Amino acid sequence: KMVDAVCRSGDCSLTPLAAVAGSFSDLALEKSLEFGAERVIINNGGDIALKDITGNIIKVGIPVNNKELVLSIDSQSKINGICTSGIGGRSFTKGIATASVVLGETAAMADACATCIGNAADVESDGIVRCYAEEIDSETDIPGNLVTLSVGELSKKEIYRALLNGIETAEKLYNENIIKGSILCIKDKIVMFPENSSYFTLEKIYA
């Protein structure tokens, strides 16, 4: 499952570990349903597998920059995975996304694609500090790859360029029916693709 998710993401720089957290969430979801659960939400450090077989809407909060985005998921949508990648997460990122959120049919697929889109959401800027992955973790699975350490002040042009790079990747994955949607946040800017979906809504932003 991990290998398949990474291969389908189209990012040849990813290893199977890009989908490990989502895959374990999927496994916990499957086992819960086998034991008769009707509404299951498994949150593995922000990589979520979810399913409601009763037909009720599932709401998921995503904290970003002291705000909370609230996603409402239609139980008929086949969205069973919501995963997040970006700066400050448990894993490395090559991009500058505050949060790269992906909705997919499985958490494994959403996990790999959140990493892929997060990596693509990038721009060259003096405000970005990077280093090689092995300088932080000698046992990393991506030695030789530059990863983002911190993101300082960015111009609006730099932010919009990075958002565009990320959302173009999201659009490609969406058009190939690999993901159900994506939300990308850089600093205080937030974009969603597709902008209008019958399967999910970005309901509210709580300050």
Regions found by a protein language model. Name each.
Residues K1-N43, E105-M192, T201-A207:
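Alpha/propeptide regions of enzymes that mature by internal proteolysis
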Residues G10-G104, M109-A110:
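Glycine-rich anion/phosphate-binding loop at the beta-strand->alpha-helix junction
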Residues G55, G61-I62, N196-A207:
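Conserved glycine-rich phosphate/nucleotide-binding loop
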Residues E68-D74, M192-S197, L202-K204:
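Short amphipathic beta-strand/extended segments with alternating polar/hydrophobic composition
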Residues S91-F92, I190-P194:
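Short active-site-adjacent structural elements
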